[in-house]
A protein has these predicted regions:
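An alpha-helical, amphipathic repeat domain used for nucleic-acid recognition
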Residues: 1-156
């Protein structure tokens, strides 16, 4: 199968960044020169667009997965999206997102309906969970205060 056919099949399943497409075509054993030609053609025809991929991924990560800006940025960088493209996509997507509400939803899901934090250990676990989800320490602290958490996870 040609690299072009493989690329079309890969892109028919889901949006891929340029790096992801190159990696997958390389994994399938296509020569570098053929991959370069195919990727160039895909870029010219707008079949491959890192900005579109970044916006779509950021919308899904924020809206469905309840992830914060910092984690989404890390994930976009891992996908091979250029930092400036990722920053622009995040600014566009997170302009419409209330980060406090996003933290509250992630916290509510993690607490499984419990109204209050019951211990210092639970507070620390929730704090670390929200950090891993890409939220800022200030936003996390404010959200934890609303569910009975202490002001600082380092207070013992």
């Amino acid at each position: 199968m040609s690299a072009y056919t493989d690329a079309l099949q890969l892109l028919a399943r889901r949006e891929l960044s340029e790096k992801q497409l190159r990696d997958r075509l390389t994994d399938r054993g296509h020569p570098a020169a053929e991959i370069a030609r195919v990727v160039e053609h895909m870029l010219e025809t707008k079949s491959l667009d890192d900005a579109r991929v970044a916006r779509a991924y950021a919308r899904t990560a924020a809206g469905v997965k309840k992830r914060g800006r910092l984690r989404v940025m890390r994930e976009l960088n891992a996908m091979g999206i250029a930092r400036d493209v990722a920053t622009e996509a995040l600014a566009e997507v997170f302009a419409d997102v209330d980060e406090r509400a996003l933290i509250a939803k992630a916290l509510q899901k993690k607490m499984r309906g419990r109204p209050r934090i019951s211990s210092a250990a639970e507070h620390a676990r929730l704090y670390q969970f929200l950090i891993r989800q890409g939220f800022t320490p200030a936003g996390i602290a404010a959200a934890l205060r609303t569910v009975g958490g202490r002001r600082d996870p380092d207070e013992e």
